[in-house]
Amino acid sequence: MALTLGTKKKVCYYYDGDVGNYYYGQGHPMKPHRIRMTHNLLLNYGLYRKMEIFRPHKASAEDMTKYHSDDYIKFLRSIRPDNMSEYSKQMQRFNVGEDCPVFDGLFEFCQLSAGGSVASAVKLNKQQTDISVNWSGGLHHAKKSEASGFCYVNDIVLAILELLKYHQRVVYIDIDIHHGDGVEEAFYTTDRVMTVSFHKYGEYFPGTGDLRDIGAGKGKYYAVNYALRDGIDDESYEAIFKPVMSKVMEMFQPSAVVLQCGADSLSGDRLGCFNLTIKGHAKCVEFIKTFNLPLLMLGGGGYTIRNVARCWTYETAVALDSEIPNELPYNDYFEYFGPDFKLHISPSNMTNQNTNEYLEKIKQRLFENLRMLPHAPGVQMQAVAEDSIHDDSGEEDEDDPDKRISIRSSDKRIACDEEFSDSEDEGEGGRKNVANFKKVKRVKTEEEKEGEDKKDVKEEEKAKDEKTDSKRVKEETKSV
């Protein structure tokens, strides 16, 4: 893996072991189990030693209504497979039922996804990390009052709203094969967020993302859409991504970046029609890292789950500036990766319908739009008091050397590059059979959820402190 030499970044990684238990239903292409596979693979590559691992706080309904409508979130909290008949009109109104089915633990799944992304943004705001990773996030199709494209709560919008408390300008980059419509819609009329999406366009879900969709009002020219055809390969993708993102960075001058790393743009994806390899996909991560800005990396689409796990493991390694071998280590889901048991995939022989002339024409049109931007728009920032969330740094010094350290403390420790000893816990964990999904329990009462949250969340992410912080910055959020 060829990486640019330089100062290594501090990386924080958010993961909840329960996320793999949620199940959209038989035959549904969205499989949260892919997040567990990714986690297990990067553990067995030893990447956990080089980053801080956190279990995210579950986002509350109040957190979600920073963007989503109250009645929509109330509906998501209430709906269950056993009471769907009572909500038939609301299911139709909120677009829940087919692509976005009702399943056991739906709201808790949304809480984990959104909680990880918002917590990642808080970490970046507090300058406690350079890169924050939440592969459970990136659900870019969800709208203010509507589920869409397997997405219910738009964790990306919630995370960007959090970043805007401390950053004047945030750029959102989407390399999922599908247009990032939900995020674009949320920020379509503001000049504080630029949305940049590289996606398949033309008789393809969600049908938006035309080159001519450029934003409106104050947000005019702050939406960038690179509409692509079938079969784009690594070489063509790199040839458009780097110049477009260089121009965006030059003209917009963001102080934070959100990168949605949807893996359905890979070759061989169950729902995709692009021809990128994992290395080609990861070149986007490598390039964005070179701008040395606070970076939030999120998941997204990806429906050939063995390749999703490969991709996001490799991109975690890229974030860490770590070289990992192509030979996959043995892991709990090793049989999924046969017959080759390698990390990297080969492109197919599909035709690249994106001619050089077509790509150049689109690129020049986008450059014309970007030239219409005023350089680095100004914004009046309100002073925000220091967060009251506690910092856990220094905890290691308080450990009793005669006692075994907790899993939580162990996760927070980052090993030096020269440290090769194996953890005594290495190799423990998950199941091998994806078919044996554990059914999660009913949606719990508010009192039960609050009790669980207090146990699960790290000191720095307690619900009490987050609520205090959200009230203090409410006016700033509303102004976006």
Swiss-Prot record:
Pull one GO CC term from this UniProt entry: cytoplasm
Q: Give one GO term, molecular function aspect.
A: histone decrotonylase activity
Alphabetized InterPro entries for the sequence: HDAC_PDAC, His_deacetylse, His_deacetylse_1, His_deacetylse_dom, His_deacetylse_dom_sf, Ureohydrolase_dom_sf
For biological process, the GO terms are: heterochromatin formation
Kindly state which reaction or reactions the protein catalyses. Answer: N(6)-acetyl-L-lysyl-[histone] + H2O = L-lysyl-[histone] + acetate; N(6)-acetyl-L-lysyl-[protein] + H2O = L-lysyl-[protein] + acetate; N(6)-(2E)-butenoyl-L-lysyl-[protein] + H2O = (2E)-2-butenoate + L-lysyl-[protein]
Annotated membrane-spanning segments are none
Q: Where in the cell is it found?
A: Nucleus; Cytoplasm
Composition-biased stretches, type Acidic residues, lie in 417-427
List the expressing tissues.
Oocyte.
What keywords tag this UniProt record?
Chromatin regulator, Cytoplasm, Developmental protein, Hydrolase, Nucleus, Repressor, Transcription, Transcription regulation
- The signal peptide annotation in the UniProt record is none
Q: Which region ranges are annotated with the description Disordered?
A: 388-480
What coarse category fits the chief subcellular location reported for this protein? nucleus
Where is composition skewed (Basic and acidic residues) in this entry? 401-416, 443-480
* Catalytic residue list: 141
Coiled coil: which residue ranges?
none
User: Which Pfam families does the entry mention?
Assistant: Hist_deacetyl
Ranges for region Histone deacetylase: 10-321
Keyword Repressor annotated: yes
Query: Which branch of life, at top level?
Result: Eukaryota
According to its UniProt record, the EC number is 3.5.1.98, 3.5.1.-
| Quaternary state and interactors | Part of a large multiprotein complex that also contains RBBP4.
**Family per UniProt?**
Belongs to the histone deacetylase family. HD type 1 subfamily.
Q: What does this protein do?
A: Histone deacetylase that catalyzes the deacetylation of lysine residues on the N-terminal part of the core histones (H2A, H2B, H3 and H4). Histone deacetylation gives a tag for epigenetic repression and plays an important role in transcriptional regulation, cell cycle progression and developmental events. Histone deacetylases act via the formation of large multiprotein complexes. Also functions as deacetylase for non-histone proteins.
**What protein name is recorded for this chain?**
Probable histone deacetylase 1-A
- Natural source organism: Xenopus laevis
Gene encoding the protein:
hdac1-a
